[in-house]
A protein has these predicted regions:
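Extracellular receptor-binding modules and their adjoining Ser/Thr/Gly/Asp/Asn-rich linkers
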Residues: 1-133
Length: 133
């Protein structure tokens, strides 16, 4: 059996400690289940707040601040600094943003990986890229 969907990610609802906009990098923690990332290379990565998931799990979850986090698939993500296609992304020191993992003699622990960049953002500023989770 095959199914089709217009959008490209599988997401699940979690209780957040505040309202978060789509594309925000999230970690496990805070006063609820999830909060936005706030430390570079955090090992507590939960995922990225989705925009329009193809499939949404835990749909009945209710609360003051429910966020849908992409678990697999293709989604936009807030980033800091230059990102090239194929870069492994980790949490940055800017809350809710990812950055490219350094590779010169450095191994990124898999628990710290958010996903891989599908598109590019070549400026030093903040921006948005498509990623594969």
């Amino acid at each position: 059996t095959a199914t089709q969907a217009t959008y490209a990610d599988l997401a699940e609802k979690y209780l957040g400690d505040a309202d978060y906009e789509p594309r925000t990098v999230m970690i496990l923690g805070g006063s609820a289940e999830v909060t936005q990332s706030d430390k570079k290379n955090s090992p507590a990565i939960a995922g990225v707040v989705t925009t329009n998931p193809a499939h949404l799990m835990n749909e009945g979850l209710e609360g003051d601040h429910v966020v849908a986090i992409a678990l697999r698939g293709r989604i936009p993500c807030k980033v800091k600094g230059p990102i090239r296609k194929g870069d492994v992304l980790i949490a940055s020191d800017i809350p809710g943003h990812a950055e490219a993992a350094p590779f010169k003699g450095y191994q990124t622990p898999s628990v710290c990986v958010i996903g891989k960049a599908i598109s590019e953002h070549l400026q030093m500023s903040e921006g948005i890229v498509e990623i594969l989770v």
